[in-house]
Amino acid sequence: MSGGKPRSNTRTVAMLAGVVVLMGALSWAAVPFYSWFCKVTGFAGTTNVAEAASDTVLDEKIRVRFDANADSNLGWTFRPMQREMELKIGENAIAFYEAINNTDEPVTGTASYNVAPDAAGYFFNKIECFCFTEQTLQPGERVEMPVSFFVDADLVNDRDAGRIRDITLSYTFHRTDPPAPKQAALDAKTEPTVN
């Protein structure tokens, strides 16, 4: 009987170690898998990237609203240059966003984006976008940043998205470079202390 227990304990330890390794591997793979899943399905408002404008333009119109947000530590003013745009489904359009660096130092940022309602994300195609690369603005610099897009004509045939005629394209700019030592010291002073 005592010969069976060590083998049983060894097997249990090996199985538990395998479970731990499997959980670690799944945790590591979850983020890239979720990103891939969102790009393929348009889940969570993820948009597509198109190589060229659509070949199919319908007579039906759709309204696209534009939204802009900037992370508080960015130091930029960021806003859409038009609140909304009405266009034909499948028609290529260009919208502009304005960014102003209000700091006394160069700041690099990147924009994350989303489309609402989520079901429209799969049909919202960007051809060119400032969100594809990091943007660096010099102190006081003002830029107009374009986004070229279209809403795929297949939207009207989709069971979930077929009735959508209002879409919101939203961007949030985040700082990607570490703040200068002077700014980091100011940020540290303003952070509340927790006891």
Curated annotation (Swiss-Prot):
A Pfam family matched in the record: CtaG_Cox11
Report keywords, A-Z.
Answer: Cell inner membrane, Cell membrane, Copper, Membrane, Signal-anchor, Transmembrane, Transmembrane helix
Q: Which residues cross the membrane?
A: 8-30
Q: Which GO cellular component terms are attached?
A: plasma membrane
For this protein, the record's Gene3D superfamilies field holds:
Ctag/Cox11 (2.60.370.10)
**Compartment(s):** Cell inner membrane
- Residues exposed to the Cytoplasmic side: 1-7
Q: Which domain of life is it from?
A: Bacteria
Biological process annotations from GO: respiratory chain complex IV assembly
Q: According to the UniProt entry, where is the signal peptide?
A: none
Tell me the residue ranges located in the Periplasmic compartment per UniProt. 31-195
Membrane-topology descriptor:
Single-pass type II membrane protein
For this UniProt entry, the molecular function terms from Gene Ontology, in alphabetical order, are: copper ion binding
What the protein does?
Exerts its effect at some terminal stage of cytochrome c oxidase synthesis, probably by being involved in the insertion of the copper B into subunit I.
Family to which the UniProt record says this protein belongs: Belongs to the COX11/CtaG family.
HAMAP family for the chain: CtaG
Designated name of the protein: Cytochrome c oxidase assembly protein CtaG
Top-level taxonomy? Bacteria, Pseudomonadati, Pseudomonadota, Alphaproteobacteria, Rhodobacterales
Gene name of this polypeptide: ctaG
